[in-house]
Amino acid sequence: MIEYGGVIYKCRRLILLSVLIYIGSVSADSLPLHQLNLPAGFRIAVFAKVENPRQLAISQSGVIFAGSRKAGKVHGLIDQDGDAYAETVLVLAEDLTMPSGLAIRGNDLYIAALSDILKISNIDQRLNQLKDPEIIYRGFPNKRHHGWKFIDFGPDGLLYVPVGAPCNICLSDNPVFASIQTLDVTAQPMIPQTFASGVRNSVGFTWHPETGHLWFTDNGRDLLGDERPPCELNEASQRGQHFGYPFIHGSSIADPKFGKKLGKLQTTAPILELGPHVAPLGIAFYEGDQFPADYRQQLFIAEHGSWNRSISVGHTGYRISIARQTSRGLEYDTFIDGWLQDNKAWGRPADILELADGSLLISDD
C-alpha cells in the first residue's frame, strides 16, 4: 500500500468535489487523482493537506475542522481567497488520544478523545492560539479497540456519542459498549443515556432531513469469511432500539457463538445491507442545489475499505457510495471509486461534509 499521510478532497459539479488529503512522504501534488472515477460533469481536487484527517466539522464563519485518529491533533483549515484550496492549516490542539470526532455547537468546538469529551470555547476567536481544550466529561471507557469516536449534536440538542465494542465479537458486561449514547452537555452532572444498543462500531451518522430519524453506519464483525457478514446502514426511529450485535449480523446471519443467546430480544434489521468488510464511516444526506436534482436528499457513504480479505478475493470498499431512494426502495451504488488499484489502496475515504456552496469535502486519512 502506498502511504501518503492525509488529505481532504473537494468534489463539485464543474461541480467540484474536494478531498482532504493526508501529509506523508509523497506530495499531494503527485496524488493520482486521474485514477478516480466520477460521474460525468463532476470534478475532484485537493482542498487541503492534513495529517490523518477523520471527522470533519464547520464553524459559523466557515472554518473547516478535521480530527485525527493516529496523529493526536485537531486541525483548522481556512480557504482565505475562496479558490477551493485551504491555504492556512492550523494545529488547534495536539497530544490528544485519538481525537477523531468533532462537533460544533454555537461557536464552541467539541472533541471526542477516547474516554473524554473536550471543548474549545469561542473557537473562531481563538484560531491562532494552540489550545489546551477543557475536559467537560471524563467517563467513557478507555479501551482503544474501537475506542475512536464520531460525534455530533442532534436536533434535540444532545451530543450523540457511539461507544464501540472492545473486541471483534464479544458480549460485554458493561452495557455502554456496542451502543450509541447521548450526553446533555449543559447538565451538571453529565450522565450518558443509551440511545441505541447492539451497535458494534458506528463511525458515522446523520439525521434524515424529513423524518428526523438517526441514520448510522455500522462496521460488521471479522473472521466469518470474505463475503460475510455485511456492513450495515441502520435507521433508528426512536430511543431504545437494539440493532443485533453480537447476536445477529446484517438482517439474518446468526453469530456462531452468540446467536443462540438472542432469546426473545427484539432487534431492528438494517435499512440496507452494505458490502462485506467495506468499513462504512461518515455519511451525509445531500441538501445542496449544486448537484443535479436527483442527488437531493440521497445519502453519500464513505467506505474506508477492507483490510483482511483474502488476496485471491481482493479488497472491497475504498470508495464513496450513494444510497438512493427509488420506486423500488433503497438502492446502493458507486459514486466515486479508483482509490483501489490492483488490490492496493492509495486512499481511504473517512468522512463527508457538505459546504454552503453545495460542494462536498471528503477526508482521506
Tell me what each language-model feature is:
Residues 29-38, 148, 165-169, 175-189, ...:
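Beta-propeller domain segments
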